[in-house]
Amino acid sequence: MIASANAASRATIHAYFTAFNSGDIAGMLACLAPDVAHHVNEGQVRHGVEKFAEFCAHMSASYSETLKDLVIFVAEDGERAAAEFVVHGRYLATDP
């Protein structure tokens, strides 16, 4: 059971980053729990999928980013995970 929880968490995280790299916001949102808490560096915490969707729409208008060299770390029980990556991108518009 633990191995399947680990694999399920890893698959969800991989699906999220695949959607991110494809610019598929709906696919990203499908990977999130309804009560997601998005902690932005140098910003306030956004709570809920709707707030995260608003953030994604804003970012898509200002930036084009791809995440490369992705490494996913998952606890054995699947309850905690982290990802490491390198961001490659460009500015599309001045961020207000």
Regions found by a protein language model. Name each.
Residues 1-96:
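C-terminal and inter-domain tail/linker signature
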